[in-house]
């Protein structure tokens, strides 16, 4: 069998050339990293859970008219996605203080934000993804002002959807990050949500207990990461059948 062409390999996902022009296959790995890759481990079943969870969130966004790169899930670890031109920015929405904003601004963890705050970070591992202003983004040509306005609008729509969804299953959406890409329909360019939405890219706290159900479990050595992600999947009704760790990757050619 012919091997698929590798397009890109990141810390948690691998992209392969898709079966049709303009498509890619996104493979979710079991690798867990923190501190820009300084802390690493392999968590059995993490890729399976993130594939299912990201599919669930992307489908839900599509159902309310938020465009995403998701086409369909192929198997337990892979999904077919649209190829996009990724804007080199991480878009972060914060509802509650946690993570870097606490140390940067001296805010106590758990403090509610007065309103959802949208931040931009330049995607560059060598620089540890520094926070940047809209002035930087426009001056360096990463995105135009209209793009930025559209990105903020997209991010806030994602926030409204995820916040309500999580609230319904007893989880607080503390913050999340997304990536946004450009696609062209003829001469018309539009922006869509890309990458993934999963507990790798969100902070999720149990509303009653404050238990962390996201990658902070790994960052802070708070317990079993797969257990936390499984709890999120169970509450949302998308828990895969059978023991997650026993599910092996299925390659397609």
Swiss-Prot record:
**Catalytically driven reaction(s):** 5-amino-1-(5-phospho-D-ribosyl)imidazole-4-carboxylate + L-aspartate + ATP = (2S)-2-[5-amino-1-(5-phospho-beta-D-ribosyl)imidazole-4-carboxamido]succinate + ADP + phosphate + 2 H(+)
Gene3D superfamilies (alphabetical): ATP-grasp fold, B domain, Phosphorylase Kinase, domain 1
What pathway or pathways are given for this protein in its record?
Purine metabolism; IMP biosynthesis via de novo pathway; 5-amino-1-(5-phospho-D-ribosyl)imidazole-4-carboxamide from 5-amino-1-(5-phospho-D-ribosyl)imidazole-4-carboxylate: step 1/2
Which UniProt keywords are present, listed alphabetically? ATP-binding, Ligase, Nucleotide-binding, Purine biosynthesis
Q: Which domain of life is it from?
A: Bacteria
Q: What PROSITE patterns would the database entry show?
A: SAICAR_SYNTHETASE_1, SAICAR_SYNTHETASE_2
State whether keyword 4Fe-4S applies: no
User: Known InterPro entries for this protein?
Assistant: SAICAR_synt/ADE2_N (IPR028923), SAICAR_synt_PurC (IPR033934), SAICAR_synth (IPR001636), SAICAR_synthetase (IPR050089), SAICAR_synthetase_CS (IPR018236)
* One of the GO biological process terms: 'de novo' IMP biosynthetic process
Give a Gene Ontology cellular component term annotated to this protein: cytosol
A GO MF label: phosphoribosylaminoimidazolesuccinocarboxamide synthase activity
Q: What is its EC number?
A: 6.3.2.6
| Annotated PANTHER family | MULTIFUNCTIONAL PROTEIN ADE2 (PTHR43599), SI:DKEY-6E2.2 (PTHR43599:SF3)
Q: Which family does it belong to?
A: Belongs to the SAICAR synthetase family.
Q: What is the protein's given name?
A: Phosphoribosylaminoimidazole-succinocarboxamide synthase
Q: Which organism is it from?
A: Jannaschia sp. (strain CCS1)
